[in-house]
Amino acid sequence: MAEFATIARPYAKALFGLAQEKNQIESWLGGLEKLAAVVQEGKVASLIDRPETNASEKADILIDLVGLKDKELKNFVIVLAGQKRLSILPEVYAQYQDLTLSFNHIKSAVIYSAYPLTDKQVGELVQMLNKRFDSELKISVEIEPELIGGIKVEVGDQVLDLSVQGKLSALYTTMTN
C-alpha cells in the first residue's frame, strides 16, 4: 500500500540510522522480520485493531511473542504502538531491508517468468543483470503465466520487460496511436 509506504519510510530511516550507530543493522533486520511476520498473523492483526486493548499491552504482547531482547527494538515497538502504527511493521521491515541492501551495495531484483527457470538459466540471468545494473543483485524468481513467454525483471524502480505480453502490449499501443 502506497499510504503505508509513505508512513513507514521515516520510521524505517530513523531505525536504520540508529542501527548504524549501534552497529546492529543485521540483527535488527532479523528482529523486524519476526515482528512483520507476527503482525500479519490473523489473531495478532485483530488484536492490534482492537481499540479496547491499550497501546502498552499491544506492545508487550508483540515483544513477548517475538522474544525481543534488544532495548532499542523494544522501544521502537512501544513507540509504534503509542502512535497506533503497529500495522505498518511489515512495510517498515521491507523499507529497512531495502536500506540494508543499499548500505551493502546490493540491489533487490525480481525476475518474473511465464515458466519455471532452471538453476543454470537463473545463474546466466544473474550474471547478465549484475553487469547491466553494475552492482550485486539479490534475486527472487516469481512465476507469472500471464507473461505468456519470456521474462520481466524489476530492479528498484527500473523494469526490463522482455515478455511476450510486453511485446504484444507495445505492438497494440503502436497500432492504436
Curated annotation (Swiss-Prot):
Electron transport as UniProt keyword: no
GO cellular component: plasma membrane; proton-transporting ATP synthase complex
Gene Ontology BP annotations: proton motive force-driven ATP synthesis
Localization in the cell: Cell inner membrane
Alphabetical keyword list: ATP synthesis, Cell inner membrane, Cell membrane, CF(1), Hydrogen ion transport, Ion transport, Membrane, Transport
Cystines in this chain: none
Membrane topology category: Peripheral membrane protein
Gene Ontology MF, one: proton-transporting ATP synthase activity, rotational mechanism
Domain of life: Bacteria
InterPro entries: ATP_synth_OSCP/delta_N_sf (IPR026015), ATPase_OSCP/d_CS (IPR020781), ATPase_OSCP/dsu (IPR000711)
TM ranges: none
Main location as per UniProt: membrane
UniProt entry tagged with the keyword Cell membrane: yes
PANTHER family: ATP SYNTHASE DELTA CHAIN
Stored HAMAP family: ATP_synth_delta_bact
Summary of the function given for this chain in its UniProt record: F(1)F(0) ATP synthase produces ATP from ADP in the presence of a proton or sodium gradient. F-type ATPases consist of two structural domains, F(1) containing the extramembraneous catalytic core and F(0) containing the membrane proton channel, linked together by a central stalk and a peripheral stalk. During catalysis, ATP synthesis in the catalytic domain of F(1) is coupled via a rotary mechanism of the central stalk subunits to proton translocation.
Family indicated by similarity: Belongs to the ATPase delta chain family.
Assembly and interaction partners: F-type ATPases have 2 components, F(1) - the catalytic core - and F(0) - the membrane proton channel. F(1) has five subunits: alpha(3), beta(3), gamma(1), delta(1), epsilon(1). F(0) has three main subunits: a(1), b(2) and c(10-14). The alpha and beta chains form an alternating ring which encloses part of the gamma chain. F(1) is attached to F(0) by a central stalk formed by the gamma and epsilon chains, while a peripheral stalk is formed by the delta and b chains.
Protein name: ATP synthase subunit delta
Annotated gene: atpH
